[in-house]
């Protein structure tokens, strides 16, 4: 069971495209390699760019499998799943940073790619299941994917 940070809302929801009815026809996809702690952007099955990431720590492992981007927010609001404390979007202590790309949910909690106020955590197993990225990297990636983009997470 995954209990990642809860994403409440966004101060600026972004819907870049409609989700394609044939998801696998999309030329852009992401592959997250948990053991290498890296996300790679593919375009027409060719690797275009790779970024270092933090992955879920023991007990909070990032789920593996095939997913799709279901949420994209700028300045996401975060609620601590244990205390209920809310941190507004854009706040320097917001653990999601300024960009959120959600790709997994159990109907209540979400897992996605996001920035971090702790750049030293990138490259480690440090999250509650999410994929942390350097803030400059998630900002770049945010504009290279869209709703419906395939996300493959491998061990």
What does each model-identified segment do?
Residues 1-155:
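N-terminal pre-domains immediately preceding structured catalytic cores
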């Amino acid at each position: 069971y995954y209990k990642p940070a809860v994403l409440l809302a966004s101060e600026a929801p972004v819907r870049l495209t409609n989700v394609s009815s044939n998801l696998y026809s999309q030329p852009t996809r992401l592959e997250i390699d948990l053991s290498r702690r890296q996300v790679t952007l593919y375009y027409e099955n060719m690797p275009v760019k790779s970024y270092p990431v933090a992955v879920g720590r023991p007990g909070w492992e990032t789920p593996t499998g095939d997913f799709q981007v279901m949420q994209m927010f700028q300045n996401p609001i975060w609620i601590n799943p244990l205390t209920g404390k809310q941190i507004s979007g854009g706040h320097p202590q917001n653990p999601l940073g300024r960009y959120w790309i959600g790709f997994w949910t159990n109907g209540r909690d979400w897992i996605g790619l996001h920035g971090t106020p702790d750049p030293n955590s990138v490259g480690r197993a440090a999250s509650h299941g999410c994929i942390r990225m350097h803030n400059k990297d998630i900002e770049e990636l945010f504009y290279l994917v869209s709703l419906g983009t395939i996300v493959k997470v491998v061990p």
